[in-house]
């Protein structure tokens, strides 16, 4: 995948996550603020917990920084897979954001 293709894919992913965070705020009464700056999306929850999702174009990876640690994801043409064999990106973000929000939320990509 070219860098341009990768960045277009990342843009779609970050837009989707940001939109879903807005839906959680409206539909589930989750206190969350989503802020986007280029290829970095920061989610800030009521208790101050931050989750940062950012693109690493040179490595063609998405990185997630959360209280529980740092995670790297690579796209295989269908899924964003953890480079260390952990859960795929939507499952990991669902768990991380559910813990931060205090209610179950689901990330779909």
Curated annotation (Swiss-Prot):
Cellular component GO terms held in the UniProt record: cytoplasm
Record flagged with keyword Metal-binding: yes
InterPro entries: CyaY (IPR047584), Frataxin/CyaY (IPR002908), Frataxin/CyaY_sf (IPR036524), Frataxin_CS (IPR020895)
The keyword Iron belongs to this UniProt entry's keyword annotation: yes
Source species, domain of life: Bacteria
Role noted for this protein: Involved in iron-sulfur (Fe-S) cluster assembly. May act as a regulator of Fe-S biogenesis.
Gene3D superfamilies the UniProt entry points to: Frataxin/CyaY (3.30.920.10)
UniProt name for this protein: Iron-sulfur cluster assembly protein CyaY
GO terms, biological process: iron-sulfur cluster assembly
GO molecular function, one term: ferric iron binding
Keywords on record: Iron, Metal-binding
Disulfide bonds: none
Family note: Belongs to the frataxin family.
